[in-house]
């Protein structure tokens, strides 16, 4: 970076040679004045108001205008004879906490660079001293023909100089305050706090000059002969007189904007995931319905076993036997009936529930009746044995 001023930092008895370079740059758009008739650029010439003659740069000097309008010529030799100790020196006058500096005083910013190898050690000493003390240095320096006030602080590994306005150059704020005694309610303060929390923080590096970019795009479009569509006016939502309503609308708009930004970041994933989720739910729902139908069919089969013509007592004992004796054929038939019924129900969704129940009932009845017959036959054998034993006893 090109230096704009060379001098030294006066730090007590220590003198640190430095170079002053601009820390900022101006990116604003500047327009030229042209003649509308032919597009020619308009130039300004220096003309003496007394003889109305054009004056060149070599014939131009400077003067101090007195209160009554009198011009008092001042030459460069006159200025060079002034006792100005800060002409080539940044003179540190005090070290103060950073919060002692009013941001209203902040002006242009510069970087201070050590000028030469011998300046590196004292430069580093001052930088580290400012870091450890958490203070800033207040200094005076002369630049572009006037003495200025400045503040030295550490930025990374560099000492920066901020130009400051003199205290008498800051206007008092009382004239800008609202007139009258205005009361703010707690509800309004709460909504304002909510709005500030909703807006959140911002990455300063992401901020840019939208107007400058729009002007550059406009100039490029006109240079290529393209037409630029007019910008659509923003919807401000109309005039809101009620402060509470305005705050509520602001909070709502901030939340909507934040939600839209969050949804825009992963909208593609949401579009891919949703159909799969619905398909999975439908599949699980279908299987659940099939299982429910199979369970209802099995219950129907169990209820039907109570209506067999064998009798109430036999039917209950047969039903009990079929449930308890897993190795018997009737239990196996019931398991097969349950599985086949579940498979048929899952494969054929349009089959009526009553038809499935009838088929299962028939199979369940057959198995239960067979078990009942076996129980009845075994019961008959037991009765015969009891009769023969009675005959022997009577004999």
UniProtKB/Swiss-Prot annotation:
Listed SUPFAM superfamilies: SPOC domain-like
TM segment ranges: none
Coiled coil ranges: none
Keywords: DNA damage, DNA recombination, DNA repair, DNA-binding
Compositionally biased spans, kind Low complexity: 362-371
Xref: InterPro entries: Ku70/Ku80_beta-barrel_dom, Prok_Ku, SPOC-like_C_dom_sf
Superkingdom in the source lineage: Bacteria
Compositionally biased residues, Basic residues: 351-361
GO terms for biological process, alphabetical: DNA recombination; double-strand break repair via nonhomologous end joining
Assembly and binders: Homodimer. Interacts with LigD.
Family: Belongs to the prokaryotic Ku family.
PANTHER family documented for this protein: NON-HOMOLOGOUS END JOINING PROTEIN KU
Name of this protein: Non-homologous end joining protein Ku
The organism's taxonomic lineage, starting at the top: Bacteria, Bacillati, Actinomycetota, Actinomycetes, Kitasatosporales
């Amino acid at each position: 970076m090109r230096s704009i001023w060379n001098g030294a930092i006066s730090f007590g008895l220590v003198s640190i040679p430095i170079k002053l370079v601009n820390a900022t740059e101006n990116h604003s758009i500047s327009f030229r004045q042209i003649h509308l008739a032919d597009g020619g650029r308009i130039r300004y010439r220096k003309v003496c108001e007394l003889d109305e003659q054009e004056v060149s740069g070599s014939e131009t000097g400077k003067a101090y205008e007195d209160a009554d309008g009198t011009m008092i010529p001042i030459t460069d030799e006159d200025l060079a004879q002034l006792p100005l100790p800060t002409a080539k020196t940044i003179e540190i006058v005090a070290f103060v906490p950073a919060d002692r500096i009013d941001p209203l005083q902040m002006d242009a910013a510069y970087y201070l660079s050590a000028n030469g190898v011998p300046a590196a050690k004292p430069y580093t000493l001052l930088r580290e001293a400012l870091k450890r003390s958490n203070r800033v240095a207040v200094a005076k320096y002369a630049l572009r023909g006037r003495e200025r006030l400045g503040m030295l602080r550490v930025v990374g590994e560099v000492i920066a100089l901020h130009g400051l306005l003199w205290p008498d150059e800051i206007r008092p704020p009382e004239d800008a305050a609202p007139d009258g005694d205005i009361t703010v309610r707690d509800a309004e303060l709460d909504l304002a706090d909510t709005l500030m929390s909703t807006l959140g923080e911002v990455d300063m590096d992401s901020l840019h000059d939208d107007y400058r970019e729009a002007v550059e795009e406009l100039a490029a479009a006109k240079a290529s002969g393209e037409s630029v569509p007019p910008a659509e006016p923003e919807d401000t939502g109309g005039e809101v007189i009620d402060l509470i309503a305005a705050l509520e609308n602001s909070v709502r708009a901030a939340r909507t904007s934040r939600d839209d930004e969050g949804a825009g970041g992963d909208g593609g994933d949401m579009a891919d995931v949703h159909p799969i989720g619905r398909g999975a739910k439908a599949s699980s729902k279908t299987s659940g319905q099939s299982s429910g139908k199979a369970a209802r069919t099995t219950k129907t089969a169990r209820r039907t076993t109570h209506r067999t013509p064998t009798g109430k007592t036999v039917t209950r004992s047969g039903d009990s036997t079929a449930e308890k004796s897993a190795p018997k054929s009737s239990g196996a038939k019931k398991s097969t009936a349950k599985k086949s019924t579940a498979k048929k129900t899952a494969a054929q969704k349009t089959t009526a529930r009553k038809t499935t129940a009838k088929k299962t009932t028939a199979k369940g009845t057959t198995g239960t009746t067979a078990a009942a017959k076996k129980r009845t036959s075994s019961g008959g054998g037991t009765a015969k044995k009891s009769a023969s034993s009675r005959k022997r006893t009577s004999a």
